[in-house]
UniProtKB/Swiss-Prot annotation:
Listed GO MF terms: serine-type endopeptidase activity
Record keywords, A-Z: Disulfide bond, Hydrolase, Protease, Secreted, Serine protease, Signal, Zymogen
InterPro entries noted in UniProt: Glutamyl_endopeptidase, Peptidase_S1_PA, Peptidase_S1_PA_chymotrypsin, Peptidase_S1B, Trypsin_dom, TRYPSIN_HIS, V8_his_AS, V8_ser_AS
Record flagged with keyword Cell cycle: no
Keyword Protease among record annotations: yes
Family according to the record: Belongs to the peptidase S1B family.
Protein name as annotated: Extracellular metalloprotease
Biased composition range(s): Polar residues: 37-60
Propeptide: 35-93
Segments of this protein annotated with the region Disordered: 35-74
GO annotations of cellular component type: extracellular region
Gene that this sequence comes from: mpr
Originating organism: Bacillus subtilis (strain 168)
EC number: 3.4.21.-
Length: 313
């Protein structure tokens, strides 16, 4: 059908109005779905919670450390399990130049005794994987998200924790994980900015070994601050604890970077320093490395709030 110019313009105007009306009907008829918060807490049982508080204050949030009693009496712990020696690493970490890590022999000293070796098993694989974690209260271990939730295998099936391990010596025994936590940004989106999590234990070793403090670094930049990374690397004698201390290299919104030497199985190690007002306090959670620096998930307001939520469960 051929339209004369006058009717062609009218027909075009009619179609334009019709399209706009249909678009309005669709947009107003179907409510828009709210964007999902990547910091939403999730657990291996499917429980979800939003512990974030939309905080914009530049004041630091601080949770203080506790040194514990340090006693090594066998009556204080939940048993002892020999952790497997064919342990696998989950994420690469780097030696930056010369390896300057030193072995921690006094693992019963604080804060080393609050540093935890993790032996992890996942569904559908016979391998055992290694990570590190650190206690933040009597029964809560903070670690990397990829230690509790593997992008290849899903949630861990079992996690065995050995505080203050020293080679074949377990001065505080071993504990089993009873609940695992991370956030949706990691478990659903695989976003390394949200690579952190926690483990609840079947006992309370923190009353004995103590726990690390943790804090945000909102009030002033952590760049240049001397910080340590302590954990259980897989390239050293099995089950031994090693540490290195260097300045923070850069501070991004979700990450801190540093040239501190680390290796596989140190994922989840505390990135910490001895603050004059709070003592041994973590400011990041070590996750992975590259050729020129290593990285950790920064303790932001949201990370702080989730750790507190998990600790209170």
């Amino acid at each position: 059908m051929k339209l004369v110019p006058r009717f062609r313009k009218q027909w075009f105007a009619y179609l334009t109005v019709l399209c706009l009306a249909l678009a309005a009907a669709v947009s107003f008829g179907v409510p828009a779905k709210a964007a999902e918060n990547p910091q939403t807490s999730v657990s291996n049982t499917g429980k979800e919670a939003d512990a974030t508080k939309n905080q914009t204050s530049k004041a630091d949030q601080v949770s203080a450390p506790y040194e514990g009693t340090g006693k090594t009496s066998k009556s204080l712990y939940g048993g002892q399990t020999e952790l497997e020696k064919n342990i696998q690493t989950l994420q690469p970490s780097s030696i930056i130049g010369t390896d300057e890590r030193t072995r921690i022999s006094s693992t019963t000293s604080f804060p080393y005794r609050a540093t935890v070796q993790l032996s992890i098993k996942y569904p559908n694989t016979s391998s055992t994987y290694g990570c590190t974690g650190f206690l933040v209260n009597p029964n809560t271990v903070v670690t990397a998200g990829h230690c509790v939730y593997s992008q290849d295998h899903g949630w861990a099936s079992t996690i065995t924790a050995a505080p203050g391990r020293n080679g074949s010596s377990y001065p505080y025994g071993t504990y089993s994980g009873t609940m695992f936590y991370s956030v949706k940004g990691w478990t659903e989106s695989k976003d390394t900015n949200y690579d952190y999590g926690a483990i609840k234990l079947n006992g309370s070793p923190g009353n004995t070994v103590g726990w690390y403090g943790y804090r945000t670094t909102n009030s002033s930049s952590p760049v240049g601050l001397s910080s340590s990374v302590t954990g259980f690397p897989c390239d050293k004698t099995f089950g031994t604890m090693w540490s290195d201390t260097k300045p923070i290299r850069s501070a991004e919104t979700y990450k801190l970077t540093y040239t501190t030497d680390t290796y596989g199985c140190q994922s989840g190690s505390p990135v910490y320093r001895n603050y004059s007002d709070t003592g041994q306090t973590a400011i990041a959670i070590h996750t992975n490395g590259g050729s020129s620096y290593n990285l950790g998930t920064r303790v932001t307001n949201d990370v702080f709030n989730n750790i507190q939520y998990w600790a209170n469960q």
